[in-house]
Curated annotation (Swiss-Prot):
Keyword Metal-binding appears in the UniProt entry: yes
GO annotation terms (biological process): cell morphogenesis; cell wall organization; lipid A biosynthetic process; peptidoglycan biosynthetic process; regulation of cell shape; UDP-N-acetylglucosamine biosynthetic process
Cofactor(s) recorded in Swiss-Prot or TrEMBL: Mg(2+)
Cofactor note: Binds 1 Mg(2+) ion per subunit.
GO cellular component, one term: membrane
Family classification: In the N-terminal section; belongs to the N-acetylglucosamine-1-phosphate uridyltransferase family. In the C-terminal section; belongs to the transferase hexapeptide repeat family.
Subunit note: Homotrimer.
Gene: glmU
Protein name per UniProt: Bifunctional protein GlmU
Positions that bind acetyl-CoA: A377, N383, Y384, S402, A420, R437
Originating organism: Gluconacetobacter diazotrophicus (strain ATCC 49037 / DSM 5601 / CCUG 37298 / CIP 103539 / LMG 7603 / PAl5)
Pfam families with a match to the protein in the record: Hexapep_2 (PF14602), NTP_transf_3 (PF12804)
Length: 461
């Protein structure tokens, strides 16, 4: 008989059985060596707690988040869900007990904010196990377990005849028990009434003087209740307690995001070199070359191409547009259909119209550039006067020559031409030509005589 409930298709929960998720998020994470609460550290551009909140919200009727004192940032992220404060950090059972008044009358699952990658499917399977779906009867207690590649010092789940008999910590395990590959992930689910009673009975007579949630497993077994393990992949149940583990979790999230992008019809030429944010949208037929970074808030429309070594955040790339290589799109930028943003071009809060091109070595900030306009190499918008930002508006079908400096606020009308090397400080009318540079003067023989004088000076020391 299998000792665990296998990873299977998700089961629907009975409509009459309410379920509450209690998320423990009070830990500061001393091993992270950070002033930031552990659950606020980002994975793929968003706080790790956000993943758990979003998945739990799709499964549970109610979510309660347990935070520590002074963790207003975490409480704000948890909104609109209920938040309770664990004034003294006295262990996981003590933390869960702070939410006991909000357990309700159905099932309660205790999740961990620093274990953010558990999927909604696994949460549903745990609740289904507790409710008895797929079994002859429900479990008095269901717990999540995994088979990590390196079991290391994880607590081992000891089973007999398909039921959990006990959790044994690595330090207390015999050689036979240490050989067990099924490990405890700490996530538990039980009926609200049972959970309240068990939490109230947990004692702190241990070396750390803390109240451990895992003790309720032994209580359930002692009462003769069925305790079952629901197995999930290690990547879902990994905890994050250090910067190294944060990096491992980031790699896991990136694998998920890349797989989703590929399944959605985007091409990633070298997926392992592309880094996505949790909210990155890549429409079908998007092509992403190697070594591209997507920050939060990026949408790339169908058929666009993002070339190598480009960095995008907070922007929209239109259908068929071409970005890079070595381009940077900053927040507030919107690149129109079939527009080009070339190598070493930076856009910030700039709209580039359909078919417009900025192919080389430009900075375009706080600007609106009309359709089919060409921006020459080296053009910049001078948008900042040291205190305020100012806008540059360039119409449709314009030609801005190379090395032009556009001093905002300034407007260039449709069809206008700006000569190369110009400094533009005044508005340019439609179809006009603007020339803002000093007239060239040639002095015959002056170059040779000047160089000769300089060489003599160098020889004289």
């Amino acid at each position: 008989m299998n000792a665990t409930v296998p990873s299977a298709a998700p089961a629907d929960l009975p409509a009459h059985r309410p379920a509450t998720a209690v998320i423990l998020a009070a830990g500061m994470g001393t091993r992270m060596k950070s002033d930031r609460p552990k659950v606020m550290h980002p994975l793929a551009g968003q706080p790790m707690l956000r993943y758990l909140l979003d998945n739990a919200a799709s499964v549970f009727d109610r979510i309660v988040v347990v935070v520590g004192p002074g963790m207003e940032q975490v409480a704000a992220l948890a909104a609109p869900h209920a938040v309770v404060v664990q004034q003294d950090r006295l262990g996981t059972a003590h933390a869960a007990a702070q939410a006991a008044d909000l357990f309700g009358t159905g099932d309660v699952a205790v999740l961990y904010g620093d274990n953010p990658l558990i999927t909604a499917d696994s949460m549903r399977r745990m609740l289904a196990c507790r409710a008895g779906e797929g079994n002859s009867e429900g479990a008095g207690l269901a717990l999540m377990a995994m088979r990590p590649r390196d079991p290391g010092r994880y607590g081992r789940v000891v089973t007999q005849d398909g039921l959990v008999r006990r959790i044994v910590e690595w330090a207390d395990a015999s050689d036979e028990e240490r050989a067990i590959t099924l490990c405890n992930a700490g996530v538990l689910c039980a009926g609200a009434e049972d959970f309240r009673r068990w939490l109230g009975a947990v004692r702190n007579d241990n070396a750390q003087g803390e109240y451990y949630l895992g003790d309720v497993v032994a209580m359930a077994v002692a009462e003769g209740r069925q305790v079952r393990a629901v197995e999930a992949p290690e990547d879902e149940l990994r905890g994050i307690n250090s910067r190294a583990e944060l990096a491992e979790a980031e790699a896991c999230v990136q694998r998920r995001l890349r797989a989703a992008a590929l399944d959605g019809g985007a091409t990633l030429v070298a997926p392992e070199t592309v880094f996505l944010a949790a909210d990155t949208v890549l429409e079908p037929d998007v092509l992403v070359q190697p070594h591209v970074v997507f920050g939060p808030g990026v949408t790339v429309r169908r058929g666009a191409e993002i070339r190598a070594f480009s960095h995008l955040e907070g922007c929209v790339v239109g259908p068929g547009a071409l970005i890079g290589p070595y381009a940077r799109l900053r927040p507030g930028s919107d690149v129109g259909a079939a527009a080009h943003v070339g190598n070493f071009v930076e856009l910030k809060a700039t709209t580039l119209g359909a078919g417009a091109k900025a192919n080389h070595l430009s900075y375009l900030g706080d600007a609106t550039i009309g359709p089919a306009t060409n921006i020459g190499a080296g053009t910049i918008t001078c948008n900042y006067d040291g205190v305020f930002k100012h806008r540059t508006d360039i119409g449709a079908g314009c030609f801005v020559g190379s090395n032009a400096i556009l001093v905002a606020p300034v407007s260039i009308g449709d069809g206008a031409l700006v000569a190369a090397g110009s400094v533009i400080t005044q508005d340019v009318l439609p179809d006009a030509m603007a020339l803002g540079r000093a007239r060239q003067t040639n002095k015959d023989g002056r170059g040779a005589s000047l160089q000769a004088a300089l060489r003599r000076k160098k020889e004289q020391g």
